[in-house]
């Protein structure tokens, strides 16, 4: 049986991606980084540059720190799992040395189904949706901002800025009736 070089490379890529761990997937999807060291992974996720991962760092790594939609029980499950694997001293602080030892022994962070996030919703929308579907950013024509994600995102903005006001109430602020020429004004009957 003969394999071509292209076939071999293709099967290697498929094999690697099928068995890529959560950390690899996270680094590629969240940070657009294909190659990294365990030390660079650790330092990138040590958000306060303290020299250790705190509970906040772990939850942020998984995108759970500012996520109110995930129940406390699930957040706690993630914390317990990561601390159990990476914190042999039991002080709830994972140092670089502890993390490197965990990785050297073949350790892999568990995939809980969360991609991992580092910023607020705006940053995440910008990073994952705008970069992918709107490469021109704000210079993109309005008619291109029509994906379900766009609509949902801008509806949230409307809710934040306008609250429970009805659309008619919101329009009052945008229309300056004094600037409308008489010939275009409605005449009451």
From Swiss-Prot:
GO terms for cellular component: endoplasmic reticulum; endoplasmic reticulum lumen; endoplasmic reticulum-Golgi intermediate compartment; Golgi apparatus; Golgi lumen. Residues 1-20 form the signal peptide. Ca(2+) binds at residues 87, 89, 91, 93, 98. This is Uncharacterized calcium-binding protein C613.03. Residues 74-109 form the EF-hand domain. It comes from Schizosaccharomyces pombe (strain 972 / ATCC 24843). The lineage of its organism: Eukaryota, Fungi, Dikarya, Ascomycota, Taphrinomycotina. It is found in: Endoplasmic reticulum lumen; Golgi apparatus lumen. Its main location: endoplasmic reticulum. It comes from the Eukaryota. GO terms for molecular function: calcium ion binding. PANTHER family: NUCLEOBINDIN, NUCLEOBINDIN 1. InterPro entries: EF-hand-dom_pair, EF_Hand_1_Ca_BS, EF_hand_dom, Nucleobindin. Keywords: Calcium, Endoplasmic reticulum, Golgi apparatus, Metal-binding, Signal. The keyword Endoplasmic reticulum applies.
């Amino acid at each position: 049986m003969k394999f071509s070089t292209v076939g071999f490379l293709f099967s290697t890529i498929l094999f690697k991606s099928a068995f890529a761990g959560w950390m690899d997937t996270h680094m590629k999807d969240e940070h657009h980084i294909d190659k990294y060291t365990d030390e660079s992974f650790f330092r990138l996720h040590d958000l306060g540059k303290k020299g250790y991962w705190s509970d906040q760092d772990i939850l942020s790594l998984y995108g759970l720190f500012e996520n109110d939609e995930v129940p406390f029980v699930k957040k706690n499950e993630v914390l317990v799992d990561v601390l159990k694997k990476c914190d042999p001293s039991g002080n709830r602080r994972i140092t670089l040395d502890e993390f490197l030892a965990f990785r050297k022994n073949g350790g892999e962070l568990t995939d809980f189904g969360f991609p991992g996030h580092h910023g607020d919703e705006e940053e995440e929308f910008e990073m994952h949706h705008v970069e992918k579907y709107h490469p021109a950013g704000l210079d993109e024509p309005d008619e291109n901002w029509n994906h379900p994600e766009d609509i949902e995102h801008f509806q949230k903005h409307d809710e934040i800025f306008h609250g429970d006001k009805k659309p008619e109430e919101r329009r009052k602020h945008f229309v300056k009736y004094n600037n409308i020429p008489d010939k275009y004004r409605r005449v009451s009957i």
